[in-house]
From Swiss-Prot:
It is an enzyme of class 5 (isomerase). Belongs to the eIF-2B alpha/beta/delta subunits family. MtnA subfamily. Catalyzes the interconversion of methylthioribose-1-phosphate (MTR-1-P) into methylthioribulose-1-phosphate (MTRu-1-P). Keywords: Amino-acid biosynthesis, Isomerase, Methionine biosynthesis. GO terms for molecular function: S-methyl-5-thioribose-1-phosphate isomerase activity. Substrate binds at residues 54-56, 91, 204, 255-256. The active site is at 245 (proton donor). This is Methylthioribose-1-phosphate isomerase. One of its GO terms (biological process) is L-methionine salvage from methylthioadenosine.
């Protein structure tokens, strides 16, 4: 996608320094566009935990390179396994991270230690390229849903969509998951409008999704997190579409905190609730998401403080709660499959159920 007319991926290896990677510092959006250089496993881990890089597919791709960096001086099995465990622990909820590391470890253990760094770069590059192709396919399948809504409306007015958090191109290597169909619909000439949940406490909707959509020229409106139900109740939402950090084998969906409340409101108002995801986000080893998906607890400061621009246009942080008030900060919640209209994957759409997922991924029936 583009920033100021220039095409970027959210992660790349510069041609003149192929032993490092570049990412955007997502904690600086939208006020500043800053590029970070990462060239060692510690820097990669810090970027993931600090959320300078975020989004389930993207952190998996970044971690893949981090594993290669860790092997520069010692490519033994012991070093490989130690680095893999270190990286997997950085964000416990997003399954793409574990998926990417497990894929890398399997590939690297198949070659001699002296060949692992070179083979690792090839595999990490492949993960990135595949992510772009997968997300483009998700976009095409989701676009069909938006077309259907537009046609049902007699091609009158606009298609109103609601999204939560950020599942756009900066959350993946390119295109995004939940936003990919929206970009394609807009580019096709379908008049879409997006209600953008602010997504407290880190405001990834108001800061990141709104910035992405605005940069692409997509009409949108930022709303308070608690306003979504009202807009659904008053007939101003045609479809909810979100991304996810982990989907279980029976279709439960872990996503940014607050997603479950949107699903409840959508269910109560007969608004379709769709989840867009690459197959790398499916955890075939877990069935009950509420019981078995670990939920990351982040710093209370993310709830107690807020960052924004002051009247002079300077970025700053202010406390928004009393000095003696504690805060809790679960980063994710789980939406039960019964509240999900369907899943949009690179292979097509399906019901949020074990049967639905296996209809698209029959090879997993035998594997698990």
């Amino acid at each position: 996608m583009k920033i100021n007319g220039i095409s970027y991926r959210s992660l790349w290896r510069p041609s003149d320094d192929a032993s490092s990677i570049r990412i955007f510092d997502q904690t600086r959006f939208p006020w500043n566009v800053e590029i970070l250089e990462l060239r060692d496993v510690g820097a990669v881990a810090d970027a993931i935990t600090s959320m300078q890089v975020r989004g389930a597919p993207l952190i998996g791709a970044v971690a893949a390179y981090g594993l290669v960096f860790a092997l520069q001086d010692d490519a033994s099995d012991e070093a490989l396994e130690k680095a893999a465990a270190f990286l997997v622990a950085t964000r416990p909820t997003a399954i793409n991270l574990r998926w990417a590391i497990e894929r890398m470890v399997a590939r690297l253990k198949a070659v001699r230690p002296t060949e692992r760094v070179a083979a690792g770069y090839v595999e990490a590059d492949a993960i990135c390229d595949e992510d772009v192709q997968v997300n483009e396919a998700i976009g095409r399948h989701g676009l069909e849903l938006i077309r259907e809504i537009w046609e049902r409306k007699g091609k009158q007015g606009q298609v109103n969509l609601l999204t939560h958090c950020n599942a756009g191109w900066i959350a993946t290597v390119d295109w995004g998951t939940a936003l990919a169909p929206i970009y394609m619909a807009h580019d096709e000439g379908i008049p879409v409008h997006v209600w953008v949940d602010e997504t407290r406490p880190r405001n990834q909707g108001s800061l990141l999704t709104a910035w992405e959509l605005g940069s692409h020229g997509v009409p949108h409106t930022v709303i308070a997190d608690n306003a979504g139900g009202h807009y659904m109740q008053t007939g101003r939402v045609d479809m909810v579409i979100v991304g996810t950090d982990r989907v279980t084998a029976q279709g439960d969906v872990a996503n940014k905190i607050g997603t479950y409340l949107k699903a409840l409101a959508a269910h109560d108002n007969n608004v379709p609730f769709w989840v867009a995801l690459p197959s790398s986000t499916i955890d075939w080893r877990v069935r009950d998401g509420v019981k078995d998906i670990p939920i990351e607890e982040r710093s209370a400061d993310e709830v107690l403080f807020m960052t924004g621009l002051d009247s002079n246009g300077e970025a700053g942080r202010v406390r928004i709660a009393p000095l003696n008030s504690p805060a809790a900060n679960p980063a994710f919640d789980v939406t039960p499959a019964r509240l999900v209209t369907g899943l949009i994957t690179e292979r097509g759409r399906c019901d949020a159920s074990e049967a639905g997922l296996q209809s698209l991924f029959p090879e997993q029936t035998k594997a698990h």
